C-alpha cells in the first residue's frame, strides 16, 4: 500500500467518524472532544478555545512560512419549534440549513437526556398522488415537518419519547 493510499484511508475513516457525531452549531462539545483526543493520539497538543473550537499547533521549523488551517466542526441542524397535533415536528434552522435542499433527508432528533430518534424531513403533505400542489409548493420550514420513525399519532405520544420544544 502506498503512503498516499494509507493517508487517504485514514482521512476517509476519520471523516466518517466525525460526521457521525451530532454537532449542530452550539452543540459541538462532543465532536470537539473527539477531534482533540485524536490529535493527542497523534502526539499533538490540542486545546479547546473559549468558543469551543479546537486549536492545534502542528509544529514546524520556519514560522515565517507558517500555514494556518481553519475548518468548521459544526454541522447544519434544526431545533424543534412545535410538536404538531399528529405528533410530527416543526423545526427552525440552526446555521445555514435551507428547506429547499433538505427535503427527504434523514434526521436524528436528540432529546435533552441524550436519547436519539430518527425520522425524515418532508413536506407536510408529501404524497405526490394526493397533493396536487406538490411540485409547485414552495419549500419552507412553515410547510415542512419531521416525520419520526416511531409510532406516534399525538403530541402526547411524541412527548412521552422525551421530545419537547
Describe every region a protein language model picked out.
Residues 1-165:
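N-terminal hydrophobic/helix-forming segments and targeting peptides
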